[in-house]
């Protein structure tokens, strides 16, 4: 019993973590990542694989990773985002749980910053983060993890 519990836990952890280190070549060559936009001199990318956690009714959570990189810098930033969707009230809330500084050449994590007391932000179409939330939702729909709900 304990062995099967350990195996299940290990598989869950492995499914959440990326299968390999992410480096700038992966992002720029679109190996499972999409270019989102350029803002303030930084290029932003999103991982095309997202994790969906079901909630009650039309409520669910999506965990998605985004990355930013600036020109000739040898580091990039990984953001682990949690989007909480409530399709009954048509709201999206967002929290950035963790930020990691990564060596852009090797993919090695240089610094981890966990934010256990990060504040939930309600997203609207004109706020930062909304586009990433909708992109993550569309990736979940495309992967068959969610069904599109129309109000």
What residue ranges belong to the model's regions?
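Sec-dependent N-terminal signal peptides
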Residues: 4-17
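N-terminal secretory-pathway/extracellular module detecting exported/lumenal segments
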Residues: 21-82, 86-151
